[in-house]
Amino acid sequence: MQPRRIVLLGSTGSIGTQAIDVVDGAPHLFEVVALSAGGGNLELLARQAVHTKAKAVGTASGDATALQRLIDDAARATGVAGYRPEIITGPDASTRIAEIEADVVLNGITGSIGLAPTLAALKSGATLALANKESLIVGGALVKAAAREGQIVPVDSEHSAIAQCLRSGTAAEVDRLILTASGGPFRGRTREELHNVSPEEALAHPTWDMGLMVTTNSASLVNKGLEVIEAHLLFDIPLDRIDVVVHPQSVVHSMVQFVDGSIIAQASPPDMRLPIALGLGWPDRVPKAATPCDWTQATSWTFEPLDAEAFPAVNLAKDAAKQGSTYPAVFNAANEEAVMAFHAGRIRFTDIVDTIEAVLSEHPGSSGLTVESVLDAEAWARARTHERLAVSSL
C-alpha cells in the first residue's frame, strides 16, 4: 500500500511541527508532498522542506530566492544534494499549495485566513484534516456545502474525541455533546479577579503549548465558544444540545451522551499527536501515535460546571451562531483584534469579551453568506473594534 500523500498548511506552527513528528513515526503510512507557512520562520520552513523532501513549498511572506537560499543551506547541512522544490510565494501561497494533488490536506493555519485554503482543499477532493476551526466557523454553510459527506475530519482534540465517540451509536441515538475545557490558567477566579490579569499570566496555560492567539483564547474561553460553534457545524447537533464542562486534567477530551443515558468518553493524556494522527489516517488509527494512560499510577479526574458569569464567551459564541450568517465571522474578527490590543497593553483582559459583545451588537448583518460577505463582515468588525478601542483609550 502506498503512503498517503499529505499537504501541511501552517507547517511551522504547533500543529504543523507535531504533524511532521507523526509522519516521521509512520513513514510507511504518510508522505509529505507539500508544505506552507506564513513566513515568520523561514529557516524552520526550509529545514522542514529538506527533511520531508516536499515537492512544493509555499510562504505568504518572503521571496522565493531567499527561501531557496535557506533550503540550499539546510540541504548542505544534512547532506541532501540537488533538492529544488517548487516554491510558491504570496498571500495566496497556502491556497495554491492546498490545490496540489494529495490524499489529505491538514489545515493547521491559525485564524480566518485559513478559509480560502480550506475551500481549495475541499474543491481538490482531498480529505481535509481540519485544525483551523476558524475557517469552518466563519465559512459556515459555505464550507459545509463545499464538502462531501465525511470529507472533513476534525483535528481539534475535542472534536476528534466526539468523532470517535459517535462511532458508538447512530445519529438518531445521540442526545447531547459534552465538550471538556481545562478551564485555562484562570479557572476558579471571579470576573472581578480577572480584570487586571497580565498577558504573561494569560499565556501560562496549564496543559497545552500553543501560539499566542489560541493560548489567549483558551484563557478567555473564547476558544471553547468557537469549539461549540465548530461542533454544531461538524456534527449537525443543535446548539442547545451542546454543553461545556470544566475538566482540569485534560484527559477526557469530550463525551457524547446517548438517548438511553449512556455517556461515551474519549480519554488519553493531552498530546495533540493523537488527534493529528487520526486526522491523517482516518478512519484508521495510527499505532503508537501517542502514549496511553498509565493505569499503574493512582489518578483522579474531576469535572465541574462552567462559570458563565466569569467566562461569558461560550454563551456569547452560541448567540452569534444562532444569529448565523456573518455573525460568527464578526465574533472571531473582533476577538482577534481585541486579543492583540490586550497583548499591546491597551485593554484589560475582561475587555476582550466585552468588546466582542459590543461589536456584535452593532453588526448590521448580511443578506446572504458568500466569501465576499464574510470578508466584508470581517473587515467591518476589525475596523469597528479598532474604533471602539481607540475611543476607550482616550
From Swiss-Prot:
UniProt family annotation: Belongs to the DXR family.
Needed co-factor(s): Mg(2+); Mn(2+)
Reaction catalysis annotation: 2-C-methyl-D-erythritol 4-phosphate + NADP(+) = 1-deoxy-D-xylulose 5-phosphate + NADPH + H(+)
Pathway: Isoprenoid biosynthesis; isopentenyl diphosphate biosynthesis via DXP pathway; isopentenyl diphosphate from 1-deoxy-D-xylulose 5-phosphate: step 1/6
Protein residues bound to 1-deoxy-D-xylulose 5-phosphate: K133, S157, E158, S182, H205, S218, N223, K224, E227
A GO biological-process term: isopentenyl diphosphate biosynthetic process, methylerythritol 4-phosphate pathway involved in terpenoid biosynthetic process
Name used for this protein in its record: 1-deoxy-D-xylulose 5-phosphate reductoisomerase
InterPro entries per UniProt: DXP_reductoisomerase, DXP_reductoisomerase_C, DXP_reductoisomerase_N, DXPR_C, DXPR_C_sf, NAD(P)-bd_dom_sf
Keyword Chaperone in record: no
Binding-site residues, NADPH: T12, G13, S14, I15, G38, N41, N132, E134, G211
The keyword NAD belongs to this UniProt entry's keyword annotation: no
Top EC class, one word: oxidoreductase
